[in-house]
């Protein structure tokens, strides 16, 4: 009888990726299968996030509920991972001594050894070190789950924004070697993945080492990923404006696989606040890069993160943020009321804005974004949109759902045989949080671009260009 594993995940897409890797790892080493309820599990893992307010207390509240399970089932093992574990490992050990394993984002690959150790000793294990890229060398081969997949290309962040805990919980920027990234994507493409989302806390800062010791920058990585047959869409998150350089904008001119959607967090539209946040750019510089990008991709949609009520934010400062939102025409935002993160420089600043003022500003910002999003959605009426079919509609299993390039969900009627493929859909209606449409053509009628098969790349020892096959831009393609 297989052992049962339950994983609860909070936070960003990187955490979702890490949780998937934990499940795959423990399946390959110990035969664990995932279950939907903690009550069914032999091992429970909590993958935590420290971004939101009161993240630590949320963890202890959850652990308190699971303590009751362990009281009834003494052999149950409980582990806490993620950014809160990295930041508050000693506190978790003291306040929740029943927790068996505490591990950081960079040590999740050591879970099998932790479980083996717990078979011989019941002493709690804590490992929140930063062994850089080691975890990727120890993870099992990827398993595709649908037509879209996340691939982590780097870890950590070296920007040290004053409000952010990431450099302290995930470490400084470390890029995966180029060959490793391309190999993982080729494996996923062999399993039917059509869209890849490149992940990193500061993904545009990717500087991956090649087989000959040189460095591959993010724009060149994108071009190489685009040559893999089957990968017809490329997304990436999260970006930093300082690293969103002109060579990346240039890639949008000749890499059609890059989608017409960009998530580029700006946090504030006020230069004074941006300086206090240590963001390294001005609102004008941000708008300038977006203006350049929209010259080559006029249909591109934009989303961003915003922090509301950062210490010292005045009404005029907030108005500058609203002006930026209108100027860029964002159609989606992840907006949060500021709350101090322990250990960050901003935590020492006086939190001098009332909760009600923060709530009022957040409401105004979200209303403006919603207004813009609805207008942009209505502009899509009667247009044809290429949609990657994800599966049955969540509301009507007789229909299918998929995602447009600009990240909108579309529901439509089509044969289930097109799941995992691209279809062209005419948009006929705009409803709350989604679109409706009619099937125009299936993928077999499209003639999508083919460059190199995943099998070619998997068979190649280096997966890297040689000087003889560089194009006029100095960008290479694979030699099968």
Swiss-Prot record:
Disulfide bonds: none annotated. Residues 143-375 form the Radical SAM core domain. Residues 378-441 form the TRAM domain. The keyword DNA-binding does not apply. Its cofactor is [4Fe-4S] cluster. Monomer. This is tRNA-2-methylthio-N(6)-dimethylallyladenosine synthase. It comes from Colwellia psychrerythraea (strain 34H / ATCC BAA-681).
């Amino acid at each position: 009888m297989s052992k049962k594993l339950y994983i609860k995940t909070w936070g960003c897409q990187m955490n979702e990726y890490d949780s998937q890797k934990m499940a795959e790892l423990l399946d390959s080493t110990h035969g664990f299968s995932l279950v939907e309820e903690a009550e069914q599990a032999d091992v429970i893992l909590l993958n935590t996030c420290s971004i939101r307010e009161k993240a630590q207390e949320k963890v202890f509240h959850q652990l308190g509920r699971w303590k009751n399970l362990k009281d009834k089932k003494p052999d149950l093992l409980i582990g806490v991972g993620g950014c809160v574990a990295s930041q508050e490992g000693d506190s978790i050990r003291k306040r929740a001594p029943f927790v068996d394993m505490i591990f950081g984002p960079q040590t999740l690959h050591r879970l099998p050894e932790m479980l083996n150790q717990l078979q011989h000793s019941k002493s709690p294990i804590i490992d929140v070190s930063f062994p850089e890229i080691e975890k990727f060398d120890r993870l099992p081969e990827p398993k595709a789950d649908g037509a879209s997949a996340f691939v982590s290309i780097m870890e950590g962040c070296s920007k040290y924004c004053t409000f952010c805990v990431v450099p302290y919980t995930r470490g400084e920027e470390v890029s995966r070697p180029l060959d490793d990234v391309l190999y993982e994507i080729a494996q996923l493409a062999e399993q039917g993945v059509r869209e890849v989302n490149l992940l990193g806390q500061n993904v545009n800062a990717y500087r991956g080492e090649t087989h000959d010791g040189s460095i591959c920058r993010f724009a060149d990585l994108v071009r190489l990923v685009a040559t893999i047959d089957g990968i017809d869409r490329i997304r990436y998150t999260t970006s930093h404006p300082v690293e969103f350089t002109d060579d990346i904008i240039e890639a949008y001119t000749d890499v059609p696989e890059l989608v017409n959607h960009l998530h580029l967090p700006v946090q504030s539209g006020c230069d004074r606040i941006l300086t206090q946040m240590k963001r390294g750019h001005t609102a004008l510089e941000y708008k300038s890069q977006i203006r350049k990008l929209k010259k080559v991709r006029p249909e591109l949609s934009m989303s961003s993160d915003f922090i509301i009520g950062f210490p010292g934010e005045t009404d005029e400062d907030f108005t500058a943020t609203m002006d930026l939102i209108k100027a860029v025409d964002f159609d989606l935002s992840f907006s949060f009321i500021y709350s101090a993160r322990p250990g960050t420089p901003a935590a020492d600043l006086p939190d001098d804005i009332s909760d009600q003022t923060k709530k009022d500003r957040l409401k105004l910002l979200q209303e403006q974004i919603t207004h813009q999003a609805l207008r942009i959605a209505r502009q899509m009426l009667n247009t044809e949109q290429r949609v990657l079919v994800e599966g049955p509609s969540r509301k009507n299993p007789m229909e299918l759902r998929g995602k447009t390039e600009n990240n909108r969900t579309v529901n439509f009627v089509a044969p289930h045989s097109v799941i995992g493929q691209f279809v062209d859909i005419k948009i006929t209606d705009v409803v709350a949080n989604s679109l409706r449409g009619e099937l125009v053509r299936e993928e077999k009628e499209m003639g999508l671009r083919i460059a190199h098969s995943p099998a070619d790349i998997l068979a190649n020892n280096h997966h890297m260009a040689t000087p003889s096959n560089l194009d006029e831009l100095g960008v290479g393609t694979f030699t099968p």
